[in-house]
């Protein structure tokens, strides 16, 4: 059986997302479960590869079916990021806001088109997105709008080897959350968890 192909959006170019993405694709445990492809800027990834002194090579591909998944080679579907001189690692800013959603949107589109089996979105910095003038309520709402799914039918899952946690509400105040939670919503969250 072929392992699933997972598109990993690299997150905030100025944040920890690219580091996490690189650590994931270089981890043998990840490769034992899936075939990862990064979605983002090769230039940004090269910046972090050099800073972290990682021994790997990037290979840009146009589509997931061109991936070879060879050891030490990280396949990247290129999505332009901000110019390297427009941001500093560790400092959120408007230059990175658009890139965060461009990377994630491209990964979600690959899944929607059936070209990958799943998407992982590395950490984003909401401050960067808002500083870029973008109205943003979190990844789940973004994914819902990108896929034409009603926002009430999208859930965020935290997943480990032994535990799955699905939030029934996201990014709202406690009073609004309590008003939204009902049996139907809990059942929808459970069904999403069981997929």
For the regions a protein language model found, what residue spans apply to each?
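Glycine/threonine-rich beta-strand-loop-alpha-helix active-site module
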Residues: 130-155
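A broad structural signal for alpha-helix termini and local helix breaks/kinks
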Residues: 52-53, 147, 153, 172
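Contiguous, glycine/small-aliphatic-enriched amphipathic segments in soluble metabolic enzymes
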Residues: 1-139, 180-195
């Amino acid at each position: 059986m072929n392992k699933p192909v997972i598109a990993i959006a690299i997150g905030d170019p100025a944040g920890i997302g690219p580091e996490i993405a690189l650590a994931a694709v270089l981890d043998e445990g990840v490769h034992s479960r899936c075939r990862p492809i990064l979605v983002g800027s090769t230039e940004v990834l090269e910046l972090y590869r050099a800073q972290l002194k990682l021994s790997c090579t990037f290979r840009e591909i146009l589509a997931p079916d061109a991936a070879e998944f060879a050891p030490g080679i990280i396949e990247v579907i290129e999505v332009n990021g901000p110019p390297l001189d427009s941001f500093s690692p560790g400092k959120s800013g408007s230059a990175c806001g658009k890139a965060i959603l461009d990377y994630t949107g491209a990964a979600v589109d690959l899944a929607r088109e059936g070209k990958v089996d799943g998407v992982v979105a590395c950490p984003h910095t909401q401050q960067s997105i808002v500083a870029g003038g973008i109205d943003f309520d979190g990844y789940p709402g973004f994914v819902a709008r990108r896929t034409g799914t009603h926002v009430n039918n999208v859930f965020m899952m935290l997943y480990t080897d032994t535990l799955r946690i699905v939030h029934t509400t996201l990014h709202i105040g406690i009073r609004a959350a309590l008003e939204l939670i009902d049996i139907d919503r809990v059942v929808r969250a459970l069904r999403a968890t069981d997929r």
